Structures are given as structure tokens and as C-alpha cells.
């Protein structure tokens, strides 16, 4: 994933700050009501489709991508056409974040199972090797050790 990947800058808090409370809440409602019909991600962009509330209208097509100055988007709804960040774009972004959270949880569960087959010595050697180059990991390991000593 490069520096221009949507995943590097797309977070719930950032999105809420960009769009404002009202639009963010309306996007959450759009997602929770099952109107997001699909979301796909590629490096640097998200694409999705949202069912409109009004019967007979065509689904809204949403695209979110990264520019040098932040997130950019397109939506075929009237609000999106006026270049405002709409609830449909928020719903697509939130659907992506939800999907990513589930994916990571599954990966971590599988990793936990795999780690049970690794010797304690190999795990310790690997952790120490990574802690030598990752200050955050080093501090996390120190915290774990300090708690265990109590």
C-alpha cells in the first residue's frame, strides 16, 4: 500500500471531521439501513453503490480517492453533484472500514492459531529481533513485562 492509499487516511474520526456531524450521522443511517449495495477497494480508491430511499430511482454510484490535499469523491446524487460530501460517500467509506475490520479480525484469529505451533524460543527470538527496529513494539513488550512482574 502506497502513501496515496485510501486506507492510510480514511478513519471514522477523520471522516466525521471532514463531513460534519449531520452528514456523518446520515451516512451511518444509510449504512445501517442496508442501503449500501456493494463496496470495492483498489489501491488509492473506493467504489460503491447505494440504493436511494425513493423507489424507482437509480442507485447512486460513489467513488472516493486520494489526492495530494486529502480525500476526493464523486457521487451521482444531487448533493454529490453540487460537490458536497454526501451521506452516500460516508456510507461507502464506513462500509469499507467495517469490511476491513472484519478482515483484520479474521487474519489475527488465523495468526493466533498458527502461533500456537511455534516454539516459545522462536517466538521470543522473533519478538526481540523486531523490537530492535520497532520502538513501539519495544515499549509494548516492556509494558507487558512490567505488568507480569507485579
Model-derived features: where do they sit?
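Long, low-complexity, compositionally biased intrinsically disordered regions
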Residues: 1-150
Amino acid at each position: 500500500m502506497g502513501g496515496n492509499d485510501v486506507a492510510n487516511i480514511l478513519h471514522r474520526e477523520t471522516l466525521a471531521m471532514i463531513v460534519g456531524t449531520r452528514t456523518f450521522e446520515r451516512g451511518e443511517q444509510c449504512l445501517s439501513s442496508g442501503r449500501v449495495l456493494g463496496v470495492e477497494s483498489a489501491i488509492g480508491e473506493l467504489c460503491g453503490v447505494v440504493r436511494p430511499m425513493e423507489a424507482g430511482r437509480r442507485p447512486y454510484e460513489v467513488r472516493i480517492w486520494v489526492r495530494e490535499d486529502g480525500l476526493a469523491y464523486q457521487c451521482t446524487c444531487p448533493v454529490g453533484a453540487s460537490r458536497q460530501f454526501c451521506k452516500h460517500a460516508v456510507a461507502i467509506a464506513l462500509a469499507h472500514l467495517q469490511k476491513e475490520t472484519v478482515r483484520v479480525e479474521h487474519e489475527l484469529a488465523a495468526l493466533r492459531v498458527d502461533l500456537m505451533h511455534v516454539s516459545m524460543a522462536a517466538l521470543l527470538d522473533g519478538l526481540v529481533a523486531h523490537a530492535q527496529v520497532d520502538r513501539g513494539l519495544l515499549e509494548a513488550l516492556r509494558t507487558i513485562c512490567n505488568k507480569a512482574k507485579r
